[in-house]
């Protein structure tokens, strides 16, 4: 299953002046849940509204051949935190929490901490690995605190948004902005009212998620750290 994965870097990163001034850039990693490339404007969806994600793509660059090796939430996140295949670690079954030797397979934030980074994770960990609490590798495993991040530079901060989770297609059509009958369906879905309703609700969910991305970027800008921060956006599997 293809997943959305797009990096946005400092545009002038190659310049000698900037490279000497920012030896270790901050890293803001924005993640969302379940949406794949078909639900984002910068990947060709002309109907969905994702101006903030599209803006990141226009300013930086995006990947077009990136795939989730374990396309379920927690197994996919186990590959993020270790850089290893889920089948290698035995974490591919959902909620398996297979124990791995952490002295041999460190978490990504462990490596960043070892070179002086302050590492934070905005509430959700869910890395599907046993033998160690997911929160133990973070300096701050709860909500993002921009003031603290500025005091602790350089930082690596994960911010996770739930709005695009597939469960947002459930429930009644209440306060839905997109019109179900105008929704463009994929060819592999039957054209029935229930599918159109799900599409309309999910378009709205992705739009709300994109607003949260915009809020995070605005907070980063207001903190005064945007010019020394690499921003990464990805969904967890799609």
Residue ranges and their predicted role:
Residues 2, 18-238:
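Formylglycine-dependent sulfatase
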Residues 4-13:
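Sec-dependent N-terminal signal peptides
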């Amino acid at each position: 299953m293809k997943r959305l994965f797009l990096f946005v870097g400092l545009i002038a990163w190659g310049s000698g002046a900037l490279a000497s001034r920012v030896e270790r850039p901050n890293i803001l990693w924005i993640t969302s849940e379940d949406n794949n490339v078909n639900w984002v404007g910068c990947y060709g969806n002309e109907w969905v509204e994702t101006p903030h994600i599209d803006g990141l793509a226009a300013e930086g660059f995006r990947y077009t051949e990136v795939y989730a090796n374990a396309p379920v939430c927690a197994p996919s996140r186990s590959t993020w935190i270790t850089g290893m295949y889920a089948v290698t670690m035995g974490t591919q079954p959902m909620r398996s929490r297979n124990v791995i030797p952490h002295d041999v397979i460190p978490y990504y934030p462990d490596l960043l901490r070892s070179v002086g980074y302050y590492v934070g994770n905005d509430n959700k960990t869910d890395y599907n690995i046993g033998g160690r609490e997911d929160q133990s590798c973070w300096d701050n495993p709860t909500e993002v605190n921009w003031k603290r991040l500025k005091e602790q530079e350089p930082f690596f901060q994960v911010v996770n948004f739930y709005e695009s989770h597939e469960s947002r297609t459930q429930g009644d059509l209440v306060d839905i902005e997109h019109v179900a009958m105008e929704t463009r369906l994929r060819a592999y879905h039957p054209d029935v009212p229930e599918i159109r309703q799900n599409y309309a609700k999910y378009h709205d969910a992705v739009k709300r998620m994109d607003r949260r991305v915009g809020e995070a970027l605005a907070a980063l800008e207001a903190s005064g750290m945007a010019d020394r921060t690499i921003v990464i956006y990805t969904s967890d599997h799609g």
